[in-house]
Each structure stands twice: as C-alpha cells, then as structure tokens.
Design a protein with these regions (language model features):
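Left-handed beta-helix
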Residues: 6, 12-19, 28-38, 65-70, ...
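Residues that mark the junctions of alpha-helical repeat units in TPR/alpha-solenoid scaffolds
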Residues: 340, 399, 404-406
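TPR/TPR-like (Sel1-like) alpha-helical repeat modules
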Residues: 348, 372, 380, 429-435
Length: 436
C-alpha cells in the first residue's frame, strides 16, 4: 500500500531462489546483496548500523576497500542491485528534484549519486525533503547478481550463468565447446574455433572462412561477406545498418570506455591511445570534421553502402594501418560518432538480419540436436518461433535417440501442430507412450 513504483537498473540480471520477505511500509525500499568487498567497490553500497541492519544509515557510491574496512567494525554493508521501490511521496520528491527550480525544465539529477546519497539516518548530502524520507534495506534472499555494464561483463556474466549447471546428468546434449567462454547466437560461422578463442561473443553476424579470430572479442551486426580479415586479440567489431542500404563500421577495444579528449594520450581506442592510433595511420585531428574533445562524440566511424569497402575499412582501422585503400576510403567517407550511431541506427534492418540468421540457426539446432541444446530449450518458445518463422516441423526422431529427447521431440511437434491449427493429439499420445 502506497509503494506503487518499482525502479530496476537496466544492465543487470538478478536471480533469486527463495521467496521474498514482507515489504515494510516506508518511503523507499532498496534491495541489496551480501557480496565480497572487492565487488562492492564497483557499485553503490547501502550501509547500516549493526544494531539496526534493516534501516539505512547512509549510502556510498563505489567506496574504497579502506572505507569498507573502516566501517566493518560498527556497520554492515549490502551492495545496491538496482531494485528500488518508491512510495508516491518519494516519487513526488524525486520528480521535484528533476526539474530546474521554479520551472518545468528537466534538470540532471541522478537516482543513485544524488537522490541515494541524501537518504538514510545519517545521509552523505543535505537535502531536507529527501533526508526526511524513511528507508528500509532488504537483503535479497538467495540472491545472485550478474552485471552487464561493460563489454567484458557481457561475457563473464553469461559464463557465470551458464556454469550454474555442471551436473552432466542434467545436460542432454553431448557437445563440448572448445572453450566454455565462447558464445555464438543468431549467426553464421565458418571458422574452426579452439581453446585459444577464450572470451568470444558472436551475435547477429556472418563470420566466413576467411576470418581469423583471437580472444577477448565481441562481433556484432556483421552482414554476409567474403572478407579475409585477421582480428587481433581484444579487438571487437560492431556493424550498424544506417538508412536503407548503408552500414557504419565501429571497431573498438574490449575495454574501451569511449571518453576523453582525442589529444590526450590517456584516451584509449582499440586498446591503445587514440593519438597512437592516428599516428600509425598517418592522419591527424584536422581529418576529423567535428568534435574532438570527447571520443564518444567524435565522428570517426565511416559509413559505406559497399560490403567489400566495409571490410577494407575494418582491416585498416584494426590490424592493417598501412592499407592505403582503407585510408583513402576513410578520408572520403561520411563519418559518425558513437552518439550519432545510436541515434540514427536502422533497427528494422538490424532485426531483419538477426531474424534471417535466427531462422537458419533454428534449423541447424533442430537437425544437430545430439550436439546442441535444442531439446533442453523452452519448448513453448521454440514452437512459437517455428510457427513465426514458417519452419518445417522437426521430424520424428529415430528409436536410438535418448528416451527423454524423443519425448521432448513429440511434445514439440504437438505444440507446433496446434499452433498451426492442426491436430496434435497423436503426438501427445506418442510422448506419453514413451513415458511408460
């Protein structure tokens, strides 16, 4: 009652294996997790007096290990997992602080570093209205926190979720990946991967036999191509469709943060300083027509309608700085910043490409069921996808297939037939016969 608004952070996956506790009647309820102090230093932290662990004393943003150690004698701390429940009163105060005083103009006001630091019995900042709000801190029972805020975390968090199941008796397929940290989805790949390709993510992409991959790489959005490309370790590729027929090439480094003046040696791009990147390619700031005070806003990513030229540009920007044709294409091309790419991307083309790859993937997973996760997927979702993509119903499996796999096969066939408006009872009966 009165707690009507839930705010959840968009770059985390929260998993809980136990029922939630009762929610107290306060203005702000925040969920937290007991975590290793080193992890807490990268996030917000709720600090509570050991005598009143359910009441927020104050909040810190990315505290140091020394700060946490100093507090540990008298206080407990929980890491903020980004799930807050606010009362109507708390929302009114938040909205008021988000406007310029005396106007209806939007002002910058951060939920965590502004609003959060003014909460608690001994808040870090003074704000009379926010300071008066009552706050409760709830540990998430059996909670797990997976952060997807960086490129590296995209892989590490997915790997951690994948490794939740290690019991081989619960895994139907017999395929063993060359490295557990290899993830390929909605893609067509023709390269042979090995244990050296650790921390590799390929999504919505065509990676042909002319590619040579390394480790610590994320490849997204690459259209069908015939490129010969040698991608260095730690170098990622993102191709984004623009307009009706163009693409923009956005290579980047796995740990690039996309901020900083282009003149500063501390501004990194593709794992090196941006100044060094320009020097190796014999270009200067005068060749960048636009902002150079911040990498996120600098127009350095070329646009082209030619798939062949797209590959040449990628090679020049990543591994072949002396590729003359690449430099000429880059200098002539219209170029966009990372901000402009986000604003102008043609998402319909992006999703259409993904759907085409996904359609082929469904067929491959079904045909290669012995070495894929196909029959351990959500069969309801799989049936919906087969009907949506107008795919043929999977054939009845042979008798030498594992009994449980054959049961799943029959039930999937039954569900697809029903969704198509056909009779699926015989398939259901066959599944139940296999249970006997």
């Amino acid at each position: 009652k009165g707690l009507n608004t839930l705010i959840a952070s968009g770059d985390v996956y929260i998993r809980s294996e136990k029922p939630l506790q009762d929610i107290p009647e306060v203005d702000v309820v925040c969920y937290g997790l007991w975590v290793n102090p080193s992890l807490a230093t990268h996030h917000g932290v709720f600090v509570s007096d050991r005598k009143k662990p359910e009441v927020l004393d104050f909040m810190l943003q990315k505290p140091s290990l020394e700060e946490l150690e100093g507090l540990s004698k008298t206080h407990l701390f929980l890491m903020d997992i980004g799930i807050w429940i606010l009362s109507d009163r708390a929302i009114e105060v938040l909205m008021k602080r988000s406007l310029k005083e005396g106007t209806n103009d939007i002002s910058y006001y951060d939920l965590y570093s502004d609003y959060g630091l003014a909460l608690g019995e001994h808040p870090q900042t003074t704000d009379d209205e926010v300071n008066k709000l009552s706050v409760a801190i709830l540990p998430l029972p059996g909670g797990e926190f997976y952060h997807f805020g960086t490129s590296r975390e995209l892989i590490s968090s997915t790997l951690a979720i994948q490794d939740k199941v290690r019991d081989q008796r619960r895994i139907m397929h017999r395929k063993v990946k060359p490295n557990p940290a290899i993830f390929i989805q909605n893609s067509f790949t023709q390269v042979k991967l090995s244990a050296e390709n650790a921390n590799l993510w390929i999504e919505n992409s065509h990676v042909g036999e002319g590619w040579k991959l390394g480790s610590r790489q994320i490849i997204t959005g690459v259209p069908e191509n015939h490129w010969n490309i040698n991608l260095p370790d730690g170098v990622c590729i993102d191709i984004v469709p623009m307009g009706d027929a163009a693409f923009v090439a956005r290579p980047y480094g796995l740990d690039d943060v996309f901020k900083g003046d282009l003149r500063n040696d501390s501004t990194t791009y593709l794992g090196n300083s941006f100044t060094q990147w320009m020097k190796e390619r014999e270009i200067g700031l005068e060749d960048i027509k636009g902002r150079t005070d911040d990498l996120q806003a600098a127009p350095v990513f070329p646009v082209t309608t030619s798939i062949e030229e797209l590959g040449i540009l990628i090679r020049w920007m990543t591994a072949e700085p002396q590729l003359k044709q690449g430099k000429e294409l880059w200098l002539r091309a219209e170029k966009l910043s990372a901000d402009e790419i986000s604003a102008q991307a043609n998402l319909e083309r992006l999703y259409a490409q993904r759907s085409a790859f996904r359609r082929d993937n469904w067929k491959g997973l079904s045909a290669n069921y012995e070495k894929s996760v196909f029959y351990q997927l959500d069969l309801q979702d799989a049936a919906n996808e087969f009907v949506r993509l107008n795919l043929e119903v999977p054939a009845v499996l042979k008798e030498d297939a594992a009994p449980m796999v054959r049961i799943h096969n029959r039930m999937l066939r039954a569900r697809i037939l029903k969704l198509q408006g056909n009779e699926g009872c015989k398939e259901e009966q066959a599944a139940f016969q296999l249970l006997r």
